[in-house]
């Protein structure tokens, strides 16, 4: 019986290693490396230390991207790789609807801190607004959802992130009823997640070798 158990787990371990080794290096690094885990945790830890020192009032807020900043979608990359496919809007939409993304390492502790400090979070993501309910469902599964959070997802192709950031700064568009906000920190995994004009808030960029513009 003992030999059977050892043999069984050996098969599982071998299958996992074989499957893992078939992944592209970028996905494998995110999924398996201690460096990726450590980097993400360090970024969130540093942000926590920095925000402790920042004066927060009713106008203060942080802007966060979602994918590969808060939500870890490496499983999507694994699945399309197994099928021999590349990214497509159709497969991505199906993945988002499943609401099965995990948390980027360190995110949960950071969100717990943000909730205690009562800091407003504004999510600016290129997820389509029609999939807001699935995104909220995913956040609830991960126990980081808060009804006070603001989600500015993409309405259409022309609805770029800088447009939505400007609405936050000026209290226009979808922010008209809420009013303008003073951004004390930005979080993202790509340069498009950060402001070139309004750079008063600190910027925290997460490693994402799986996709991007370069």
For every predicted segment, state its role.
Residues 71-72, 77-105:
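Metal-dependent phosphoesterase signature
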Residues 67-75, 193-195:
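Short acidic, Gly/Ser-rich segments with clustered Asp/Glu that frequently serve as metal-coordination loops
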Residues 2-5, 16-64:
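Non-catalytic pre-domain segments flanking phosphatase-related domains
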Residues 55-62, 121-126, 151, 176-179:
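Surface-exposed patches in mature extracellular/periplasmic domains of secreted proteins
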Residues 94-122, 129-130:
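Short, acidic loop-to-helix structural element flanking the phosphoryl-transfer center
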Residues 62-70, 129-131:
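Acidic helix-start/capping segments at beta-turn-to-alpha-helix junctions
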Residues 25, 31-34, 38, 128-214:
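C-terminal cap/substrate-recognition subdomain and adjoining C-terminal extension
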Residues 52, 56, 76, 112-120, ...:
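Sec-exported extracytoplasmic/periplasmic mature domains
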């Amino acid at each position: 019986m003992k030999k059977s158990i050892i043999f069984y787990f050996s098969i599982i371990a071998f299958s996992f290693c074989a499957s893992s080794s078939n992944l592209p290096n970028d996905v494998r690094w995110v999924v398996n490396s201690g460096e990726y885990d450590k980097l993400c945790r360090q970024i969130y830890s540093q942000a926590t230390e920095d925000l402790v020192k920042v004066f927060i009032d009713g106008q203060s807020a942080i802007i966060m991207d979602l994918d590969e900043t808060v939500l870890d979608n490496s499983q999507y990359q694994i699945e399309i790789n197994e099928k021999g496919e590349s990214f497509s809007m159709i497969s991505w939409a199906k993945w988002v609807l499943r609401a099965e993304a995990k948390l980027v390492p360190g995110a949960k502790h950071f969100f717990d801190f943000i909730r205690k400090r009562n800091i407003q979070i504004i999510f600016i993501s290129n997820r389509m607004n029609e999939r807001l309910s699935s995104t909220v469902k995913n956040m609830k599964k991960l126990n980081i959802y808060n009804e006070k959070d603001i989600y500015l997802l993409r309405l259409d192709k022309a609805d770029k992130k800088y447009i939505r950031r400007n609405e936050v700064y000026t209290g226009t568009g979808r922010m008209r009823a809420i009013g303008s906000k003073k951004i004390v920190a930005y979080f993202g995994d790509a340069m498009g997640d950060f402001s070139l004009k309004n750079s008063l808030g600190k910027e925290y960029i997460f490693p994402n070798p799986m996709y991007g513009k370069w």
